[in-house]
Curated annotation (Swiss-Prot):
D-aminoacyl-tRNA deacylase, with no observable activity on tRNAs charged with their cognate L-amino acid. Hydrolyzes correctly charged, achiral, glycyl-tRNA(Gly). Deacylates mischarged D.melanogaster and E.coli glycyl-tRNA(Ala), protecting cells against glycine mischarging by AlaRS. Acts via tRNA-based rather than protein-based catalysis; rejects L-amino acids rather than detecting D-amino acids in the active site. It comes from Danio rerio. This is D-aminoacyl-tRNA deacylase 1. GO terms for biological process: tRNA metabolic process. The gene is dtd1. Homodimer. The keyword Cytoplasm applies. SUPFAM superfamilies: DTD-like. Residues 142-207 are annotated as: Disordered. NCBIfam families: D-aminoacyl-tRNA deacylase. A Gly-cisPro motif from one monomer fits into the active site of the other monomer to allow specific chiral rejection of L-amino acids. It catalyses: a D-aminoacyl-tRNA + H2O = a tRNA + a D-alpha-amino acid + H(+); glycyl-tRNA(Ala) + H2O = tRNA(Ala) + glycine + H(+). It is found in: Cytoplasm. Residues 156-167, 178-189 have a biased composition (Basic and acidic residues).
């Protein structure tokens, strides 16, 4: 999931001739949902949007307060073009989640924002509509966010599984098991360590 977050003095969304949403001071969030996004990506973005410290405090100290600290507004606008991949000069949007899946996913994120913050301070555009978005950037301050990708490389997944198995195996071993393994490794490195000891024993048995 990708987001372009802008600190604004005001922002609004117009569809046709009707202004359907507007905010004063706060954040305008353009949100691009990927076909690979899950609830973990929603949780990450909600947490970051609401806690990002891009506002000054009462003493004028910059980068000190979040939108929640100042009880400011948030305007979210669905923006599938953030998932663009260029093929030459032509944008390709196959990485974006299809609209029929993205709309409930987006609505779920809005609901989570409202549950975490004050619902009356979370505004949005109109999903799938052709919108005119007016953004009066304050600063300007523009921050690009991207949720951490889940590991999809089979080699990376296999490596992580092996590392986890080694950790579990180490935890389950007793001290004696570990000591025996170390002794076995030493004997492989220095074969004379074991053969010499056996020779001493046999020589004691000879008359």
């Amino acid at each position: 999931m990708k987001a372009i977050i802008q600190r604004v003095t005001r922002a609004s969304v117009t569809v046709g001739e009707e202004q359907i949403s507007s905010i004063g001071r706060g954040l305008c969030v353009l949100l691009g949902i990927s076909v690979e996004d899950t609830q973990k990506d929603v949780d990450y973005m909600v947490r970051k949007i609401l806690n990002l410290r891009v506002f000054e405090d009462e003493n004028g100290r910059a980068w000190s307060r979040s939108v929640m600290d100042g009880e400011l507004e948030v305007l979210c606008v669905s923006q599938f073009t953030l998932q663009c991949l260029l093929k030459g000069n032509k944008p390709d949007y196959h990485a974006a989640m299809p609209a029929e899946l993205a709309q409930p996913f987006y609505n779920n994120m809005l609901e989570q924002l409202r549950e975490t913050y004050k619902p009356e301070l979370i505004k949005d555009g109109q999903f799938g509509a052709k919108m005119q978005v007016l953004i009066q950037n304050d600063g300007p301050v523009t921050i690009q966010l991207e949720s951490p990708p889940a590991p999809t490389d089979p080699k990376l997944l296999s490596k992580q599984e092996k590392q986890q198995q080694r950790k579990e195996k180490t935890r389950s071993k007793g001290p004696s098991d570990s000591s025996r393994e170390k002794a076995a490794q030493r004997s492989k490195v220095d074969p004379s360590a074991s053969s010499g000891a056996e020779g001493d024993v046999s020589s004691e048995r000879e008359p």
